Regions:
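Structural recognition of an alpha-helix C-terminal capping motif at a helix-to-coil junction
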Residues: 48-55, 68-80
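Internal acidic/polar
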Residues: 1-6, 92-116
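N-terminal module of bacterial RNA polymerase sigma factors
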Residues: 1-30, 38, 179
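Hydrophobic-face residues of short alpha-helical interaction/recognition segments
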Residues: 32, 36, 61, 74, ...
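A short pre-motif secondary-structure segment
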Residues: 137-141
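Sigma70-family region 2
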Residues: 13, 54-69, 89
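Arg/Lys-rich amphipathic alpha helix in sigma70-family domain 2
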Residues: 63-65, 79-96, 168
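Amphipathic, Lys/Arg- and hydrophobic-enriched alpha-helical face
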Residues: 25-43, 60, 127, 176-179
């Protein structure tokens, strides 16, 4: 944790903040991209949300209190940015979040950046049937292999509730895959 404190100090100091922020980008760009991509599904939208995430991190690093890990704090920002983006996109299109997600899934098949096979696509369709929170928990646990404690810090939910949510999500996905 001491190393993180030193790193945050470098992010805050005018003489070292640009170099430190470059390091932050190198360290977290790929995992945050994957996290956001799991939520918004579209490559171009993911790039936009990722850029907004790093802008918010840079603008708000001075407000980071150190109550959680920097990683968790940034993931929370990325999660909120991605969910807000989806809500705004659905609102602009005059459709519900569920309908917007279905449209995104339909586009996923033709997305040149989607490297999954038919099984992966079926899994994404199964995940899309889950409530938003269960989707988020499932994706963070299954795809990103985050620990429950890390997810707890990111989504501000107890570990017990996360375990229950993940278990329910797995059951629903299994059921969907059996039927389809």
């Amino acid at each position: 944790m001491q190393d993180e404190k030193v790193f945050i100090d470098r992010l805050l100091h005018p003489k070292t903040q640009h170099e430190a922020f470059r390091e932050l980008l190198q360290l977290y760009q790929k995992p945050l991209y994957n996290h956001i991509r799991n939520i918004v599904l579209n490559h171009d939208d993911t790039d936009d949300v990722l850029q907004n995430t790093f802008i918010k991190v840079f603008q708000n690093i001075k407000n980071f209190k150190g109550k959680s890990k920097l990683f968790s704090w940034m993931y929370r920002i990325a999660t909120n940015e991605a969910l807000s983006f989806l809500q705004q996109k659905a609102k602009k299109q005059g459709i519900s979040n569920v309908e917007a997600q279905q449209k995104a899934l339909n586009k996923l098949e033709s997305d040149v950046f989607f490297d999954g096979d038919e099984i992966q696509l079926k899994l994404q369709k199964a995940i899309a049937t889950l409530p938003e929170k269960q989707q988020l928990v499932f994706k963070m646990k299954y795809f990103e292999e985050l620990k429950y404690e890390e997810i707890s810090e990111i989504v501000d939910t107890s570990v017990g509730a996360l375990k229950a949510s993940y278990h329910l999500a797995v059951k629903k996905i299994e059921e969907y895959l059996k039927v389809n």
